[in-house]
């Protein structure tokens, strides 16, 4: 049985164009974002806030990376948790090449997550989606320890869930520190 949430305020973002000011409260001039791989974003509010957050960070990211692209993963990439082998399709993949370390490519998994998935402690840790965030963080741990891929030319990273109100600053900080 599926559960549906009805937004009585009428401000649900899913299905609305992010580049159309009359349709969205989270407008971005998508046509000017050469790093965003699509013509528009019809995603959830958290997905739109992620695009905005990346835009605001782009100057910092371009100082260390080139060829930066944010891709919406729509069933193209499926990854499997280390603990139980559960399938997971992160909503976004940020790809980049390192300017300072020569021929190093970055692949960063990002999952925007709405507040409806928070647990009773206002975190995602013990929510039904918590295993996904744990897995994303395990990817980063294994990348840093070089147990995921023993090759300095490739970096595979998972970020904590992105939520505009709860974790935006943590995700921003993690991206800056990579």
PLM regions with names:
Residues 1-178:
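Intrinsically disordered, low-complexity, repeat-rich regions
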